[in-house]
Amino acid sequence: MSKITFKITLTSDPKLPFKVLRVPENTPFTAVLKFAAEEFKVPPATSAIITDDGIGINPSQTAGDIFLKHGSDLRLIPRDRVGLRWTR
C-alpha cells in the first residue's frame, strides 16, 4: 500500500506553522483532518481544510482522492462559532 504526504499549514497563526503528515492512500480524509487539528491543538469539529487557492475540500473522500484532486499543500482553518445564530 502506498502512502501520501500532505503539508498542512495552520492559517490562523501569523507564523504559518505547518505539519507534514504521511498517511496510507485509502485513509479517510476525515481522519487526516482530525489528526491535523489535534496536532495544532485546535478543535477538529469546527475545523476545515482548504487548498492554497482557497477552495474548500469535502473531507468525505479518501486521502488518495484528495491528493489527486488538490495536491499535497493544504491549509487548516479553525472556524469559530460555525453556524451560530444570535437571537434575542
Swiss-Prot record:
Q: Does the keyword Transport apply?
A: no
Spell out the GO cellular component terms annotated for this protein, sorted alphabetically and separated by semicolons.
Answer: cytoplasm; nucleus
What residues does the annotated propeptide cover? 84-88
Give the position of the cross-link Glycyl lysine isopeptide (Gly-Lys) (interchain with K-? in acceptor proteins).
Answer: 83
Q: Which family does it belong to?
A: Belongs to the UFM1 family.
**Summary of the function given for this chain in its UniProt record:** Ubiquitin-like modifier protein which binds to a number of as yet unidentified target proteins.
Q: Which UniProt keywords apply?
A: Isopeptide bond, Ubl conjugation pathway
Which PANTHER family does this chain map to?
Answer: UBIQUITIN-FOLD MODIFIER 1 (PTHR15825:SF0)
Recorded protein name is Ubiquitin-fold modifier 1
Organism from which the protein derives: Argas monolakensis (Mono lake bird tick)
**Which GO terms of type biological process are on file?**
protein K69-linked ufmylation
Domain of life of the organism in this record?
A: Eukaryota
Q: Which cysteines form disulfides?
A: none
